[in-house]
From Swiss-Prot:
Cross-referenced Pfam families: Proteasome (PF00227)
Family: Belongs to the peptidase T1B family. HslV subfamily.
GO CC, any one term: HslUV protease complex
Entry protein name: ATP-dependent protease subunit HslV
PANTHER family on file: ATP-DEPENDENT PROTEASE SUBUNIT HSLV, METALLOPROTEASE TLDD
Catalytic residues in the record: T10
Organism: Rickettsia africae (strain ESF-5)
Length: 182
Protein backbone atom coordinates (compact mmCIF):
# COMPACT_ATOMS: atom_id res chain seq x y z
CA UNK A 1 0.00 0.00 0.00
CA UNK A 2 1.06 3.56 -0.57
CA UNK A 3 1.57 6.32 1.97
CA UNK A 4 -1.72 7.74 0.75
CA UNK A 5 -3.87 5.86 3.26
CA UNK A 6 -5.13 9.18 4.62
CA UNK A 7 -7.33 9.41 1.54
CA UNK A 8 -9.67 6.87 3.08
CA UNK A 9 -8.93 7.33 6.78
CA UNK A 10 -12.06 8.97 8.14
CA UNK A 11 -15.82 8.75 8.38
CA UNK A 12 -18.17 11.51 7.26
CA UNK A 13 -21.94 10.92 7.39
CA UNK A 14 -24.83 13.15 6.36
CA UNK A 15 -28.50 12.38 6.74
CA UNK A 16 -31.89 14.03 6.57
CA UNK A 17 -34.85 12.94 8.66
CA UNK A 18 -38.03 14.94 9.21
CA UNK A 19 -36.50 18.09 7.71
CA UNK A 20 -33.52 17.85 10.09
CA UNK A 21 -30.14 17.60 8.34
CA UNK A 22 -27.06 16.49 10.27
CA UNK A 23 -23.47 16.05 9.13
CA UNK A 24 -21.14 14.10 11.42
CA UNK A 25 -17.41 13.43 11.28
CA UNK A 26 -14.95 11.54 13.41
CA UNK A 27 -11.81 13.28 14.63
CA UNK A 28 -9.00 10.93 13.66
CA UNK A 29 -6.20 11.86 11.28
CA UNK A 30 -4.03 8.92 10.25
CA UNK A 31 -0.96 8.52 8.11
CA UNK A 32 -0.48 4.91 7.19
CA UNK A 33 -1.04 2.95 10.39
CA UNK A 34 -0.19 5.86 12.71
CA UNK A 35 -2.74 8.14 14.38
CA UNK A 36 -1.45 11.70 14.05
CA UNK A 37 -4.37 13.46 15.71
CA UNK A 38 -7.59 12.35 17.37
CA UNK A 39 -9.42 15.70 17.61
CA UNK A 40 -9.38 17.01 14.04
CA UNK A 41 -12.28 19.10 12.81
CA UNK A 42 -13.36 17.86 9.38
CA UNK A 43 -16.57 19.89 9.09
CA UNK A 44 -16.85 23.47 7.90
CA UNK A 45 -19.81 25.82 7.60
CA UNK A 46 -20.63 28.38 4.93
CA UNK A 47 -23.33 31.05 4.77
CA UNK A 48 -24.11 31.20 8.51
CA UNK A 49 -24.53 27.41 8.91
CA UNK A 50 -26.89 27.21 5.93
CA UNK A 51 -24.35 25.05 4.08
CA UNK A 52 -22.09 22.50 5.76
CA UNK A 53 -19.27 20.49 4.21
CA UNK A 54 -17.30 17.53 5.47
CA UNK A 55 -14.20 16.21 3.76
CA UNK A 56 -12.23 12.98 3.60
CA UNK A 57 -8.78 12.60 2.14
CA UNK A 58 -5.74 14.77 2.35
CA UNK A 59 -6.42 17.53 4.87
CA UNK A 60 -4.70 20.20 2.81
CA UNK A 61 -6.57 19.10 -0.31
CA UNK A 62 -9.89 19.02 1.53
CA UNK A 63 -9.34 22.53 2.86
CA UNK A 64 -8.32 23.77 -0.59
CA UNK A 65 -11.52 22.36 -2.10
CA UNK A 66 -13.60 23.80 0.70
CA UNK A 67 -12.13 27.26 0.03
CA UNK A 68 -12.91 26.93 -3.68
CA UNK A 69 -16.44 25.76 -2.93
CA UNK A 70 -16.99 28.72 -0.57
CA UNK A 71 -16.00 31.10 -3.37
CA UNK A 72 -18.40 29.38 -5.80
CA UNK A 73 -21.21 29.56 -3.24
CA UNK A 74 -20.73 33.30 -2.88
CA UNK A 75 -20.54 33.73 -6.67
CA UNK A 76 -23.79 31.81 -7.17
CA UNK A 77 -25.75 33.44 -4.33
CA UNK A 78 -25.74 30.38 -2.04
CA UNK A 79 -27.08 28.03 -4.73
CA UNK A 80 -25.38 24.83 -3.56
CA UNK A 81 -26.19 22.62 -6.55
CA UNK A 82 -24.97 25.15 -9.11
CA UNK A 83 -21.86 25.89 -7.02
CA UNK A 84 -21.04 22.19 -6.73
CA UNK A 85 -21.43 21.64 -10.48
CA UNK A 86 -19.21 24.65 -11.22
CA UNK A 87 -16.59 23.38 -8.77
CA UNK A 88 -16.75 19.95 -10.43
CA UNK A 89 -16.14 21.54 -13.84
CA UNK A 90 -13.08 23.31 -12.45
CA UNK A 91 -11.95 20.13 -10.70
CA UNK A 92 -12.02 18.19 -13.96
CA UNK A 93 -10.36 20.82 -16.14
CA UNK A 94 -7.70 22.33 -13.86
CA UNK A 95 -4.35 20.46 -13.78
CA UNK A 96 -3.73 21.45 -10.16
CA UNK A 97 -7.21 20.54 -8.92
CA UNK A 98 -7.15 17.16 -10.69
CA UNK A 99 -4.28 16.15 -8.41
CA UNK A 100 -6.18 16.89 -5.22
CA UNK A 101 -7.01 13.77 -3.25
CA UNK A 102 -10.18 14.49 -1.36
CA UNK A 103 -13.92 13.90 -1.35
CA UNK A 104 -16.61 16.07 0.17
CA UNK A 105 -20.16 15.80 1.40
CA UNK A 106 -21.96 19.13 1.22
CA UNK A 107 -25.51 19.84 2.38
CA UNK A 108 -28.04 22.61 2.62
CA UNK A 109 -31.80 22.49 3.35
CA UNK A 110 -32.53 21.14 -0.15
CA UNK A 111 -29.59 18.95 -1.16
CA UNK A 112 -27.12 16.42 0.13
CA UNK A 113 -24.26 16.11 -2.38
CA UNK A 114 -21.13 13.99 -2.66
CA UNK A 115 -18.28 15.62 -4.60
CA UNK A 116 -15.68 13.08 -5.73
CA UNK A 117 -12.07 13.38 -6.76
CA UNK A 118 -13.12 12.63 -10.33
CA UNK A 119 -15.20 15.79 -10.44
CA UNK A 120 -18.51 13.98 -9.98
CA UNK A 121 -21.48 15.50 -8.17
CA UNK A 122 -23.76 12.79 -6.78
CA UNK A 123 -27.05 13.34 -4.97
CA UNK A 124 -27.58 10.09 -3.06
CA UNK A 125 -30.88 8.30 -2.63
CA UNK A 126 -32.59 7.72 0.70
CA UNK A 127 -31.40 11.02 2.23
CA UNK A 128 -28.16 9.46 3.50
CA UNK A 129 -24.57 9.84 2.29
CA UNK A 130 -21.23 8.75 3.71
CA UNK A 131 -17.60 8.88 2.62
CA UNK A 132 -14.26 7.71 3.93
CA UNK A 133 -12.99 4.37 5.15
CA UNK A 134 -15.79 4.05 7.69
CA UNK A 135 -18.38 5.43 5.30
CA UNK A 136 -19.98 2.14 4.33
CA UNK A 137 -20.34 1.12 7.98
CA UNK A 138 -21.94 4.46 8.89
CA UNK A 139 -24.14 4.42 5.78
CA UNK A 140 -25.39 0.89 6.48
CA UNK A 141 -26.11 1.65 10.12
CA UNK A 142 -27.89 4.92 9.29
CA UNK A 143 -30.07 3.33 6.63
CA UNK A 144 -31.04 0.50 8.98
CA UNK A 145 -31.81 2.87 11.85
CA UNK A 146 -33.82 5.19 9.60
CA UNK A 147 -35.87 2.23 8.37
CA UNK A 148 -36.60 0.60 11.72
CA UNK A 149 -36.21 3.19 14.49
CA UNK A 150 -38.88 5.81 13.82
CA UNK A 151 -38.55 7.32 17.29
CA UNK A 152 -34.90 8.40 16.83
CA UNK A 153 -33.97 11.92 15.75
CA UNK A 154 -31.54 12.59 12.91
CA UNK A 155 -28.89 13.51 15.49
CA UNK A 156 -29.40 10.25 17.42
CA UNK A 157 -29.21 8.20 14.22
CA UNK A 158 -26.03 10.00 13.15
CA UNK A 159 -24.37 9.46 16.53
CA UNK A 160 -25.28 5.76 16.72
CA UNK A 161 -24.16 5.21 13.11
CA UNK A 162 -20.85 7.01 13.63
CA UNK A 163 -20.17 4.99 16.77
CA UNK A 164 -20.78 1.76 14.87
CA UNK A 165 -18.40 2.93 12.14
CA UNK A 166 -15.76 3.87 14.73
CA UNK A 167 -16.09 0.42 16.32
CA UNK A 168 -15.41 -1.25 12.97
CA UNK A 169 -13.02 1.09 11.13
CA UNK A 170 -9.49 1.41 12.52
CA UNK A 171 -9.05 4.74 10.71
CA UNK A 172 -12.01 6.37 12.51
CA UNK A 173 -12.55 7.21 16.17
CA UNK A 174 -15.32 8.03 18.64
CA UNK A 175 -14.48 11.76 18.82
CA UNK A 176 -17.55 12.69 16.81
CA UNK A 177 -18.45 16.23 15.82
CA UNK A 178 -21.89 17.01 14.43
CA UNK A 179 -23.30 20.09 12.72
CA UNK A 180 -26.93 20.81 11.92
CA UNK A 181 -27.97 22.65 8.76
CA UNK A 182 -30.15 25.61 9.74
Amino acid sequence: MSDNLSLHGTTILCLKKNEEIIIAADGQVSHGNTVLKSTARKLRTIANNKIIAGFAGSTADGLALFEKLAVKIEQHKHNLLRSAVELAKDWRSDKYLRRLEAMMIVADRSHILILTGNGDVVEPENNVAAIGSGGLFALSAARALMSYENNLTAEEIALKSMNIAADLCVFSNHNIIMEKVV
